[in-house]
From Swiss-Prot:
GO terms for molecular function: 4-hydroxybenzoate polyprenyltransferase activity. The chain crosses the membrane at residues 21-41, 44-64, 84-104, 106-126, 142-162, 212-232, 235-255, 267-287. This is 4-hydroxybenzoate octaprenyltransferase. The gene is ubiA. NCBIfam families: ubiA_proteo. Catalyzes the prenylation of para-hydroxybenzoate (PHB) with an all-trans polyprenyl group. Mediates the second step in the final reaction sequence of ubiquinone-8 (UQ-8) biosynthesis, which is the condensation of the polyisoprenoid side chain with PHB, generating the first membrane-bound Q intermediate 3-octaprenyl-4-hydroxybenzoate. InterPro entries: HB_polyprenyltransferase-like (IPR006370), Prenyltransferase (IPR039653), UbiA_prenyltransferase (IPR000537), UbiA_prenylTrfase_CS (IPR030470), UbiA_sf (IPR044878).
Amino acid sequence: MPISKQKWIAYAQLMRFDKPIGTLLLLWPTLWALFLSVKGMPDLSILSIFVLGVIFMRAAGCVINDYADRHIDGAVKRTSKRPLATGAATPEEAKWLFVLLVFCSFILVLFLNTYAIVLSFIAVFLAFIYPFMKRYTHLPQLFLGMAFGWSIPMAYGASIEALPLECWLLFFANLAWTVAYDTQYAMVDRDDDLRIGVKSTAILFAQYDNKIISLLQIVTLFFLGLIGYLSQLHTSYFVVLFLATLLFVYQCKLIKDRERESCFKAFLNNNYFGAMVFVAFLFGIFFDKL
């Protein structure tokens, strides 16, 4: 029996193909790691595998997230129109779609070295457990940070078969950044989450949310600056990184009054930060070769 057009649309929405921001936020640190690990242009086959892997795994993460939240999404204004909440897709379909996406990702990983294959099992584990953490801890954003950042050690493993200090500095820079921007995202849903009993850093940080987000952003910049110093990147890296800092200043102004629309706008702005840091790495790496 052929799949209807409505089902294809529901599956695409389950995978968030209509909202690419999450894919971009996962892609940027992956690109940082791929270029920084080799201090130049990564192998095109490895680059292609990781870009496709980002698309598949982000889609898988969205599907399992909606499956985990299928009983509460209908009670939250922002998520009430998701396919599982409306019945456009079934939980059984979501489970099979998740398995298919993880399988496709694993097929891609098999074209990498053993180092990356071993690390990929941790990636799947983190992607699977993250959606359920909001029921047990106020720190689900920390688990998202680990899940979104695990592409960094995988990139190093695939490229140089080693996980040097630089790799972990980049991982923790991304971890702090992810917790910061996902807290901004959680601020949008805070009232609904309090009502239905879902946990988040936005609830945990309470009236200190703005200050802690700013602190996390400072930590992100510190680690990125330290990477540039230890890796002896070209001065242009630090110039572009400074310009990226201005985006954090802008975000702090947006979330100051904790309005839903402004917090969501601040969250979306992080795409530009990730892109600017990527440009900073390109300048720092390639200008040094001139």
